[in-house]
């Protein structure tokens, strides 16, 4: 991991970098990385920040996104991503894992993990994926208190306030909540499950804060390009579960191939080579730490 062979950035440095990226002219594309390997591949592709999705993280644990995991578990995974990449990470902390005191504890745990930014939503527990039916919301006042709690105990954390009100209170309700959350101290707004390009434009016209779009697949929101979202007035876009979906489908294919043919040979071309793997995880840098380790030479 990068923190062993590189000088790790502090939480404040990472948070300041995230704030800078939010303000740049080009929209900030933030891919979801459910583990450190995915994070390293995303960094290699040239991304400047990463997203840890609650949905993707829980799925990687073999669990549904129903508020089952704990703040400590999520912070541990977030720490893996930060240590591996030295990039600012935006972490989905769901509802904050409980009431105001739970939110304060969660914020402290994210600070200790060197997380740059957190995303907190206004659903009630047990929460659900934002693109499913049956979501229930907390009051605006309760969400305000949660945002204020993060500000108080972790003032360097960037706060992205997510509202799921589009499904329950309509677009105007989502806009109203967004503006309340900004007044409470949110640094950016994530309006979940918008249903058209026009809705993205209307939110941008009525909310004066950096805006984050969710380009998740198979949901209520139509897929739009980064350029289209930027033109609509959004500053950030996440792809929360994309890499996990692709990886899971690759698992299905290779496991079925081995089961059917008794060998993986026909799938070799789809694999990362040993050399590519070692480059991704900075194998040589680790080896160089210990002069007593014989230099590994890979064949072509």
UniProtKB/Swiss-Prot annotation:
Keywords: Lyase, Magnesium, Metal-binding. It catalyses: 3-hydroxybutane-1,2,3-tricarboxylate = pyruvate + succinate. One of its GO terms (molecular function) is metal ion binding. Its EC number is 4.1.3.-. Gene3D superfamilies: Phosphoenolpyruvate-binding domains. The keyword Metal-binding applies. Substrate binds at residues 53-55, 129-130, 162, 192, 214-216, 245, 274. Its cofactor is Mg(2+). Mg(2+) binds at residues 92, 94. GO terms for biological process: propionate catabolic process, 2-methylcitrate cycle. It comes from the Bacteria. Coiled coil: none annotated. InterPro entries: ICL/PEPM, Isocitrate_lyase_ph_CS, PrpB, Pyrv/PenolPyrv_kinase-like_dom, Pyrv_kinase-like_dom_sf. It holds the Pfam family PEP_mutase. Belongs to the isocitrate lyase/PEP mutase superfamily. Methylisocitrate lyase family. Involved in the methylcitric acid cycle. Catalyzes the cleavage of 2-methylisocitrate to yield pyruvate and succinate. This is 2-methylisocitrate lyase. The gene is mmgF.
């Amino acid at each position: 991991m990068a923190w062993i062979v590189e000088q790790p950035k502090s939480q404040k440095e990472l948070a300041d970098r995230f704030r800078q990226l939010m303000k740049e002219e080009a929209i900030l594309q933030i891919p979801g990385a459910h583990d450190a390997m995915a994070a390293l591949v995303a960094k290699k592709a040239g991304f400047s920040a990463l997203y840890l999705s609650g949905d993707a993280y829980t799925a990687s644990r073999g669990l549904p996104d129903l508020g089952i995991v704990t703040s400590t578990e999520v912070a541990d995974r977030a720490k893996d991503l930060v240590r591996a990449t030295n990039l600012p990470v935006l972490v989905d902390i769901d509802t904050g894992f409980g009431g105001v005191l739970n939110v304060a504890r969660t914020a402290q745990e994210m600070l200790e993990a060197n997380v740059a930014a957190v995303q907190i939503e206004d659903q009630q527990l047990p929460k659900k994926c934002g693109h499913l039916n049956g979501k229930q919301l907390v009051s605006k006042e309760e969400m305000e208190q949660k945002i204020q709690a993060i500000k108080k105990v972790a003032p360097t954390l960037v706060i992205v306030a997510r509202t799921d009100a589009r499904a329950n209170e309509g677009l105007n309700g989502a806009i109203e909540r967004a503006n309340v959350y900004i007044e409470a101290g949110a640094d950016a707004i994530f309006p979940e499950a918008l249903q058209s390009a026009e809705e993205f434009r209307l939110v941008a016209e009525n909310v004066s804060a950096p805006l984050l779009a969710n380009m998740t697949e198979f949901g209520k929101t139509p897929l739009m390009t980064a350029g289209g979202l930027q033109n609509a007035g959004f500053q950030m876009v996440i792809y929360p579960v994309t890499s996990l979906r692709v990886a899971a489908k690759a698992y299905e294919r290779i496991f079925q191939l081995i089961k059917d043919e008794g060998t993986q040979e026909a799938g070799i071309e789809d694999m990362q080579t040993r050399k590519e793997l070692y480059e991704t995880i900075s194998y040589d840098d680790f080896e160089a730490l210990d002069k007593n380790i014989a230099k590994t030479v890979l064949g072509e």
